[in-house]
Curated annotation (Swiss-Prot):
Its EC number(s): 2.1.1.-
Subcellular locations according to the entry: Nucleus
Family: Belongs to the class V-like SAM-binding methyltransferase superfamily. Histone-lysine methyltransferase family. SETD6 subfamily.
CDD domains: SET_SETD6
Source organism of this protein record: Salmo salar
Pfam family, one: Rubis-subs-bind
Domain SET: 32-257
Database matches in InterPro entries: N-lys_methylase_SETD6 (IPR011383), Rubisco_LSMT_subst-bd (IPR015353), Rubisco_LSMT_subst-bd_sf (IPR036464), SET_dom (IPR001214), SET_dom_sf (IPR046341), SETD3_SETD6_MTase (IPR050600), SETD6_SET (IPR044430)
Protein's UniProt name: N-lysine methyltransferase setd6
Alphabetically ordered keywords of this record: Methyltransferase, Nucleus, S-adenosyl-L-methionine, Transferase
Biological process according to GO: negative regulation of NF-kappaB transcription factor activity; peptidyl-lysine monomethylation; regulation of inflammatory response
Keyword Transferase tagged: yes
Keyword Metal-binding: no
Sequence intervals crossing the membrane: none
Amino acid sequence: MATDAKRLKTEGSDPLQSFLQWCEGVGLKLNNKVYISKEGTVAEYGMLAKEDIDEGELLFTIPRMALLHQGTTKVLAVLEEGKASLENTSGWVPLLLALMYEYTSPQSHWRPYLSLWSDFTALDHPMFWSKDERDRLLKGTGIPEAVDTDLTNIQKEYKDIVLPFITLHPDLWDPERHTLDLYRSLVAFVMAYSFQEPLDEEDEDEKDPNPPMMVPIADMLNHVSNHNANLEYTPECLKMVSVRSIRKGEEVFNTYGQMANWQLLHMYGLXEPYQSNSNDTADIPMSNVYKAAVQVTRSEAEQRLLVEKWSLLCEMEMVGDKGVFIFGKSGSLTDTEMYTTLKILCMSVEEFEDFRENEGWEEADDDEEKMLQALSNEGLPSLPPVWRCLVHAAARFTLDSYGEDMLKDKVLLEDKDGYAKLSSRQRRALQVRYGQKTILHQLLELTKP
């Protein structure tokens, strides 16, 4: 570990040079074995190993005063004074207001850091794609619907909370400069680059999550599910530590958590190549399971019984209008909800009446381990035939909702020349689509009659 912050030389990268000099000034210390670059990385800036690095080595430390958040910004006092008017469900507004001020202030303490993103054009979240492009490339993935919700919420938040607040403080913000477009870009910036300090275990059930914060240097590391470094939090500083050995020339990767490809694209604008993401998932809308159950009803009496069963599942909070059952590469990740739903939907009239009258959802025999095993890849083929039928039909309905045929996507992925001609957006969308379809297709195979 360097005793002083290491000034890294990068030819032709003035913003990066200024930033690294700023890092020295604020006491951010980099290990001599690593350097920041745009070359040789999977996306934009990244960190590379200059020498072999052992597991457990300290890669850099960041003093807490170098973090940018509502408690360190120059407009702290104003944000504290208006705290009540800035409350919202996301908890992001104070940080976003701080960023709006610091990003546009020539005297900002964080200017060398924020200058690395001169105009946010590098951010290519689906929220910046046209609606037609989202709907065409990402149909069935769940991303278009998530983005529509985001954009509606961002506009409402800016109009109802941010604009009235900045109008009250014309010495700090200007609606002509601090526009909705800038606010939207900063939301994407926070989505892609911010960190949220985890709560202590004893506080998890009692406290709200910590607000997001910007962490210079740490936010330049790219993500893969099989990461080789991890950020640790201490009262004095934040530390990036290698969690396995890193060879000279390899990129240093942090992790954003267990993120499926659709989440990575939605929140970070990136996607891991097909098969690389061990955390990839596919969602089956709960409404598709209901649709599958409707298909097998043979009389009005059975249809009425199905409505009663679904109503009870809603009361039990096992299903909801916009809910989804999540499947990963090894089986269900929402096993309690999926198992309980299948069990109740497949009950006879007598079984259902007994279950409802005796509050059967409290039965001890359906333990978590049993449900987990039943809905794993190993357990799915052994489910009762009627259960498998519902899962199979729901998976088929979900696969049919995608715009592109699975075989066409497969051919495109395997055609190196054709794949190379795709735009970055087309490639990322393809990775997301095909990863989800593969999981759903596997589910079809495991539940076929």
